[in-house]
Swiss-Prot record:
Name this protein carries in UniProt: Ornithine carbamoyltransferase
Native organism taxonomy: Bacteria, Pseudomonadati, Pseudomonadota, Gammaproteobacteria, Pseudomonadales
Gene3D superfamilies xrefs: Aspartate/ornithine carbamoyltransferase (3.40.50.1370)
Gene Ontology annotations of biological process type: arginine biosynthetic process via ornithine; citrulline biosynthetic process; L-arginine biosynthetic process
One GO cellular component term noted in the UniProt record for this chain: cytoplasm
Predominant localisation class: cytoplasm
Keyword Transferase set for record: yes
InterPro entries, per the entry: Asp/Orn_carbamoyltranf_P-bd (IPR006132), Asp/Orn_carbamoylTrfase (IPR006130), Asp/Orn_carbamoylTrfase_sf (IPR036901), Asp_carbamoyltransf_Asp/Orn-bd (IPR006131), Orn/put_carbamltrans (IPR002292), OTCase_ArgI (IPR024904)
Keywords: Amino-acid biosynthesis, Arginine biosynthesis, Cytoplasm, Transferase
Function: Reversibly catalyzes the transfer of the carbamoyl group from carbamoyl phosphate (CP) to the N(epsilon) atom of ornithine (ORN) to produce L-citrulline.
Binding site for L-ornithine: 162, 219, 223-224
EC number(s) from the headed UniProt entry: 2.1.3.3
Binding site for carbamoyl phosphate: 53-56, 80, 104, 131-134, 259-260, 287
């Protein structure tokens, strides 16, 4: 299969990733000026959801429509994927009928197996390992507000989860330093840490992580599929709540990001999203624009007239 996929930030070169977020800025400007731009007319994106979603579904579906194409929502409950059809078989059929596939799933191996058997581009809409589309939006948001992130310091506060893993990949590809503050036993995947080398430092003190940082980011303490751990995680992660006082230790021009949905009063203080340093709403909107840039990059242009 010769299709180009987007399963990880490491699938592309740094120049390609920078080009994508710059293109996201351009597409956002076109949208804001009311310019009609439909390079993907008559193209169809399939969206396979094993995990529930608000931002991922809205941004991909609206983005594909705005680019002139269409999007089809497919849940495990409504397809043979949920009844045990092998992933490889499903991929071979689905990719003959669509022009691209976005998958939001649990096991990352589901994505890699689907992509290995797909004729068309496969996009990681989220897996337990990675959330690369969110990082495109985050990097676009930083670019819009502060310019290049190269050489800057980023602090990740909380669970070493899929978002944290993607921040590690972004640190490599966009050349910034990343400090991860998490409780013992909740570090990022060692494979990602090994890949990053000296670009990533793991600490136990959130104050040490945030000191002088140009960007501070966090996520929920309990991800989907971990609900039984909620009480224990709340107790362990309580010292890692991001507050206005914690942000005061960062660079004077620091930005705060959260991929949402946020649990106010848990990983962030109740008032943090309303702080002037928070760009979470721009960050959420940029899922739309960054992913439009990705779709434009991956999906072949419109068909020629017969």
């Amino acid at each position: 299969m010769n299709a180009r996929h987007f399963l990880s930030m490491m699938d592309y070169t740094p120049d390609e990733l920078l080009g994508l977020i710059r293109r996201g800025v351009e597409l956002k400007d076109l949208r804001n000026r009311g310019v009609l731009f439909e390079p993907l007319k008559n193209r169809v994106l399939g969206m396979i959801f094993e995990k529930s979603s608000t931002r991922t579904r809205l941004s991909f579906e609206a983005g594909m429509i705005q680019l002139g194409g269409q999007a089809i929502f497919l849940s495990h409950r409504d397809t043979q994927l949920g009844r045990g059809e092998p992933i490889a078989d499903s991929a071979k059929v689905i990719s003959r009928m669509l022009d691209a596939v976005m998958i939001r799933t649990y096991a990352h191996d589901n994505l890699t197996e689907f992509a290995a058997n797909s004729r068309v581009p496969v996009i990681n809409g989220l897996s337990d390992d990675l959330h690369p589309c969110q990082l495109l939006a985050d990097m676009q948001t930083f670019l819009e507000h502060r310019g290049s992130i190269k050489g800057k310091t980023v602090a990740w506060i909380g669970d070493g989860n899929n978002m944290c893993n993607s921040y590690i990949e972004a640190a490599i590809q966009f050349d910034f330093q990343l400090r991860v503050a998490c409780p013992a036993g909740y570090e990022p995947n060692p494979e990602f840490l090994a890949l990053a080398g000296e670009r990533v430092t793991v600490v136990r003190d959130p104050k040490a992580a945030v000191a002088g940082a140009h960007l501070v980011s966090t996520d929920v303490w309990t991800s989907m599929g971990q609900e039984e751990e909620t009480a224990r995680r709340k107790a362990l992660f309580a010292p890692f709540q991001v507050t206005r006082a914690l942000l005061d230790l960062a660079d004077k021009d620091v930005l705060f990001m959260h991929c949402l949905p946020a649990h106010r009063g848990e990983e962030i203080s109740v008032d943090l999203l309303d702080d002037a340093r928070s760009v979470a709403w721009d960050q959420a909107e940029n899922r739309l624009h960054a992913q439009k840039a990705l779709l434009e990059f991956l999906v072949a242009p419109c068909f020629q007239p017969a």
